[in-house]
């Protein structure tokens, strides 16, 4: 993918500016962590970024964006709806095809939810729903991944599994994270947001938890 250049992005709610102006460059091959306290503007920045690159991005929103009445398989399959003709998508809705089952099942196996393949999302726990949303983005195979707290409902080992899969599947990503240790381990650049502004932007190798904690 080409580099993404964001210039003077702003956002306002209720007449009050909550983000920006922010300028940010995202280079191919970068794994960027957005860090900062809740309400700092991370989700708003991700949403604005998605508006700029939606044609080449996979998104894991904080609210997950799953269809509760559909199965895990169908929610994951939705990651590639645009890649297939409508008749084929309808066919998969009625009776999942072998090709897609053979692609999606191993992905769910690695995420620890292959036994939920045909279960409706509404029957899942919060962590299982989160992994379903991540599986959908991984299956999409876009140029860039944007994820808003994709491991917030997962315990330590599972969080590492998911972050490892994300790093493996996507060469370029921007991920909002609360967990500083995960940000330092799986991302090579840290962008800290405070009060709607970029307060920190540096390579992970030059940072320690003590450099990031003041943002919280």
Model-inferred region functions:
Residues 120-124, 128:
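Conserved ABC ATPase signature
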Residues 134:
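Hydrophobic anchor residue at the start of the ABC signature
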Residues 89-116:
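Conserved ABC ATPase "signature" region
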Residues 145-148:
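Catalytic Walker B motif of ABC-type/P-loop ATPase nucleotide-binding domains
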Residues 197-216:
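Conserved beta-strand-loop-alpha-helix hinge in the C-terminal portion
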Residues 177-178:
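H-loop/switch region of ABC-family ATPase nucleotide-binding domains
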Residues 4, 19-21:
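Conserved structural motif at the start of ABC-family nucleotide-binding domains
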């Amino acid at each position: 993918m080409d580099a993404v250049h964001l210039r003077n992005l702003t956002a306002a709610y209720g007449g009050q500016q909550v983000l920006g102006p922010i300028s940010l460059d995202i280079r191919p091959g970068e794994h960027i962590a957005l860090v900062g306290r809740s309400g700092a503007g991370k989700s708003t920045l991700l949403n604005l970024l998605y508006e700029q690159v939606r044609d080449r991005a996979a998104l894991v929103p904080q609210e997950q964006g799953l269809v509760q009445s559909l199965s895990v398989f169908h929610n994951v399959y939705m990651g590639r709806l645009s890649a297939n003709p409508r008749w084929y998508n309808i066919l998969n809705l009625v009776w999942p095809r072998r090709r897609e089952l053979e692609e999606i099942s191993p992905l769910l196996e690695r995420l620890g939810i292959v036994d939920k393949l045909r279960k409706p999302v509404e029957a899942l726990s919060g962590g299982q729903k989160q992994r379903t949303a991540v599986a959908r983005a991984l299956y999409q195979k876009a140029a860039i991944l944007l994820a808003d707290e994709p491991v917030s409902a997962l315990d330590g080992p599972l969080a590492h599994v998911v972050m490892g899969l994300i790093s493996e599947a996507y060469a370029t990503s921007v991920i909002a994270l609360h967990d500083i240790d995960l940000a330092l381990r799986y991302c090579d650049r840290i962008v800290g947001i405070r009060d709607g502004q970029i307060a920190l932007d540096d390579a992970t190798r030059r940072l320690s938890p003590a450099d990031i904690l003041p943002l919280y």
